[in-house]
Amino acid sequence: MKAPFHSHPTSPDAADAAVYVQTNLVSDIPGLATVTDPHLVNPWGVSFRSGSPFWVSNQATNSATLYSVTDSTDVNNPVPVFTVNIPTTETGPQGPTGQVSNTNASSFKLTDGNLMSANFIFADLNGTISAWNPSLGTDGSTAHIEVTTPGAVYTGLAVNEAHTMLYAANDSAGTIDVFNSSFDPVDLGHHAFRTPGQIEARGLVPFNVTDIGGDVYVTYAPSGREAQTMAGPGDGAVAIFSESGKLEPHGVLLGGPHTPLAAPWGVAIAPDDFGKFSGDLLVGNFSYLDSEINAFDPKTHKFEGTIPIFAGSGQRPGGLWTLTFGGGGGDGSPSTLYFTDGIDGETHGLFGAIESVPLTKATQQLVQTMASFGSPSAPENSNISPHVDETSQQLLTIPQHA
């Protein structure tokens, strides 16, 4: 279930030589990952509380499932997997998308009568935002709808640092909808989270929203599922706002021929021990045509390189969603990048991990051995070999862009 990536073609003796290793943790496809879970189909949002397992939103099965990961890639899960149902509505698209956790005991209290704060909150394509806490039950319980916005299609969700405001990306309206700690709509002013002109001119709308350290990153994509799945380089952008919705100076990152953003959704800031891309802004492309992770200098927005995602033998890439680093308990390692992917055209699912591993003599020998297998299905400008066996290892060399 592991796939090593060269971070860049360099001598194995170079001080910064490293390999990025992908580990498939959970999939609905038997044999593709360490754990098989049929609920994990088109997984979107991921969140966790300190020490908790990962909570993963599964759009295609209207569920959230829990996976405990320790030591970066060790999945320790009961069978069956703990599952929470996300409520559906009678009409419109369905399924949970973005997800956040809440640790503020005074915020986001459920209105089902128990008046306890939500532990986890879910946005949905059906225009609802639902919430869950243990008072609703354990395995098999159902989250409670707290927000219903007619006509909305919520494709992403974020919470501010104080856990007192929610931000929801509304694909149908092209807006960021804001809610207070009582789940009531908030008007931050006409210009708050307004799509920058150079992004609006491209016909792009908010696709996801992520709060990282008090900076709110909004990713933009073409409106509508078909346009998003077929987006190419240039069909995407990122804008950085304050938590009050003010665009930050130099806060716009546009896609283009040398900035390969294609319907981007997931965003993360790499820690200082993540190899070549340490400290970089990582942006994941959802597009089926360019489903990959692109790294940028967080200050200059200079494009630094790409990490491809290996979807598995026989599976098509496409549908890359969350990027997040772990928390240090049952929520993985802070040095490991975790991702969700609706592989095979969002008909299946993958929850995986990417680590930066020093390119020691042993790993260099492994890389050389695997490289000898050739690359029958590699995309242009990359060097991708088939896996050594059905589920074990692959070599994906990060493309070198001009």
Named regions from a protein language model:
Residues 2-393, 401:
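Sequence/structural signature of beta-propeller domains
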